[in-house]
C-alpha cells in the first residue's frame, strides 16, 4: 500500500488512516488507492466494519488536492473505483463505515465523511463545502447527500457560500453521531465499531439494503417492496442460522456467535 494510506486490521475491524502532507488532500492517485481499499473491505468476509480517519489533529481531509488541480488534474478526472476518495460512489456496500473526523473536513473530505454510515468527530472538527468559491461544485455527494439531512436554507448557505459548521452544530443537526475530545476520538470510534460487530452481519446488510432501496418510497409501498422477494439480504436473513442463533443465545444468557449465514 502507498505511503498515503495506513491500514490496520483489529480482528474484523479495518482502520484506514489518510496521511498526506498539506491537509490530507486527495489526488486521483490516492483516490484510486482508497477505492481499492474499500472494495477489498467490501469483498473480505473476515472484515465487518471500517473506520476512516486522517493523520494528525488538524485535518481529516481538505478534499481534492488543489495542487494536483493546478498541475492539470481535471475536476472530472477518473478518481477510480468507488468515485472520489474511494467511497462516495460505492452504493452497494453492505458493511458499515465510520468516519472518525479528527479536524477540518472540507470539500471532498466532507463528502467522504457523508458517504460513511456514522460520523464520530473531535470537538475541533469543522465541516464545509467551499467548492463554489473555487468555481466548481460538490458533486461527489455533498450536494446530493446533505439535502437529505439539513433543511434547504442551511444547505443553500453551505453549498453556495462555503459556510463552515462546527462540531456541536453538526451534532445538533444530526450530521454527526458523537462529538468527543481529540484524545478520545479513535477509542470512541473503535467502541462504536465493536458495537456494530456485536450485531449480526446479515442483519446489518439487510438494514443497509432496505435503507438504500426504500428511502424515497412511501411507507406502504416500501412494505410491499421489502416483502416482494426482490431484495438480496432481507429474505435470506429471515431464514438464516443467525436468526436462530440470536434468540437461542438470548434464552441461554450468552453472547451470540454469528456465522453470517
UniProtKB/Swiss-Prot annotation:
BP term (GO), one: fatty acid beta-oxidation
Record-linked PROSITE patterns: ENOYL_COA_HYDRATASE
Keywords of the record: Lyase
SUPFAM superfamilies tied to this protein: ClpP/crotonase (SSF52096)
InterPro entries: Carnitinyl_CoA_dehydratase (IPR022852), ClpP/crotonase-like_dom_sf (IPR029045), Enoyl-CoA_hyd/isom_CS (IPR018376), Enoyl-CoA_hydra/iso (IPR001753), Enoyl-CoA_hydra_C (IPR014748)
Signal peptide: none
Pathway as given in its UniProt record: Amine and polyamine metabolism; carnitine metabolism
E.C. number: 4.2.1.149
Family: Belongs to the enoyl-CoA hydratase/isomerase family.
Function noted in UniProt: Catalyzes the reversible dehydration of L-carnitinyl-CoA to crotonobetainyl-CoA. Can also hydrate crotonyl-CoA to hydroxybutyryl-CoA.
UniProt cross-references to HAMAP family, sorted A to Z: CaiD
Listed NCBIfam families: PRK03580.1
Protein name: Carnitinyl-CoA dehydratase
Protein source organism: Escherichia coli (strain K12)
Amino acid at each position: 500500500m502507498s505511503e498515503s494510506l495506513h491500514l490496520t486490521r483489529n480482528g474484523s475491524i479495518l482502520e484506514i488512516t489518510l496521511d498526506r502532507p498539506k491537509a490530507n488532500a486527495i489526488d486521483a492517485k490516492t483516490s484510486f488507492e482508497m477505492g481499492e481499499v474499500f472494495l477489498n473491505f467490501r469483498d473480505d468476509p473476515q472484515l465487518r466494519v471500517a473506520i476512516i480517519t486522517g493523520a494528525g489533529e488538524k485535518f481529516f481531509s481538505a478534499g481534492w488536492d488543489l495542487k494536483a488541480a493546478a498541475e492539470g488534474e481535471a475536476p472530472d478526472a477518473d478518481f477510480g473505483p468507488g468515485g472520489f476518495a474511494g467511497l462516495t460512489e460505492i452504493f452497494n456496500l453492505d458493511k458499515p463505515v465510520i468516519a472518525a473526523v479528527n479536524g477540518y473536513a472540507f470539500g471532498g473530505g466532507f463528502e467522504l465523511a457523508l458517504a460513511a454510515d456514522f460520523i464520530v468527530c473531535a470537538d475541533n472538527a469543522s465541516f464545509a463545502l467551499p467548492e463554489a468559491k473555487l468555481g466548481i461544485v460538490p458533486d461527489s455527494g455533498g450536494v446530493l447527500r446533505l439535502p437529505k439531512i439539513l433543511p434547504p436554507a442551511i444547505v443553500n448557505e453551505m453549498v453556495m457560500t462555503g459556510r463552515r459548521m462546527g462540531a456541536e452544530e453538526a451534532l445538533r443537526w444530526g450530521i454527526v453521531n458523537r462529538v468527543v475530545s481529540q484524545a478520545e476520538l479513535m477509542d470512541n470510534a473503535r467502541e462504536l465499531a465493536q458495537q456494530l460487530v456485536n450485531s449480526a452481519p446479515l442483519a446489518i446488510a439487510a438494514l443497509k439494503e432496505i435503507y438504500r432501496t426504500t428511502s424515497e418510497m412511501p411507507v406502504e409501498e416500501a412494505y410491499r417492496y421489502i416483502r416482494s422477494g426482490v431484495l438480496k439480504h432481507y429474505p435470506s436473513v429471515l431464514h438464516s442460522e443467525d436468526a436462530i442463533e440470536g434468540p437461542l443465545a438470548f434464552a441461554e444468557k450468552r453472547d451470540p456467535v454469528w456465522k453470517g449465514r
